[in-house]
Amino acid sequence: MLLEFTKMHGLGNDFMVVDLISQRAYLDTATIQRLADRHFGVGFDQLLIVEPPDVPEADFKYRIFNADGSEVEQCGNGVRCFARFVHERHLTNKTNITVQTKAGIVKPELGQNGWVRVNMGYPKFLPNEIPFVADEPEALYTLELANDQNISIDVVNMGNPHAVTIVPDVLTADVAGIGPQVESHKRFPERINAGFMQVIDDKHVRLRVFERCVGETLACGTGACAAAVSGMRRGLLANSVEVELAGGKLQIEWQEGDVVWMTGPTTHVYDGRLDLRYFQG
């Protein structure tokens, strides 16, 4: 069968977006892995699926699958692309959209020239909300790594879980070495996304993220939210912060006790069609 799709990216975090309202397809783990292959498939960080919602307050249901086929709760760069996709495909004429995710409701607002502002919901900090193994909640935690190395982290759930550590320079940070250790650490029973943040000043940070089940990506929207919120909680950052990632910049806004707002661009790369039989086992 032929499957129509769209390739998009948010700051280099790239997606295959599939409308399963107007067409039908069964995409199992093995099929997703084959589609994600950058040599023999479409190639992407995540597959984004558009489905009818299960709850009356939502316009759409948004499902996210990593390149290894695992389903995850949230993707900040993805939800911006999702919002642009459903609008450009005329699945809705709304510019303010309510989207059901595995982590709850998010509300993207379409702006001009592909920019989207998203209500990302409330950040969560308690160990059982991450989840993270800890005796009691603390502002910062010490994580023991290999070779008697320790790092100080904050933990934030932005629809998916993040550990944030502050580094002197993101360019020289050992993301490839430390990232996998944090991601699969025994204190994170569902694994974790590891963020490495450099504070430039109170309105500007640089960030690299080693994503759970993916590895380091050019950008991570929920990671940018988690890092900014972590810095604000520590008293290092103002309530509106520019987060600079390898793929570009996001603006993150947060007030204590309120929702987090993320604003950033989207890019429509191309529309495609493929014979799904070649990717199924």
Swiss-Prot record:
This is Diaminopimelate epimerase. It comes from the Bacteria. Coiled coil: none annotated. It is an enzyme of class 5 (isomerase). It comes from Acinetobacter baumannii (strain SDF). It catalyses: (2S,6S)-2,6-diaminopimelate = meso-2,6-diaminopimelate. The record marks 162, 211 as: Could be important to modulate the pK values of the two catalytic cysteine residues. Keywords: Amino-acid biosynthesis, Cytoplasm, Isomerase, Lysine biosynthesis. GO terms for biological process: lysine biosynthetic process via diaminopimelate.
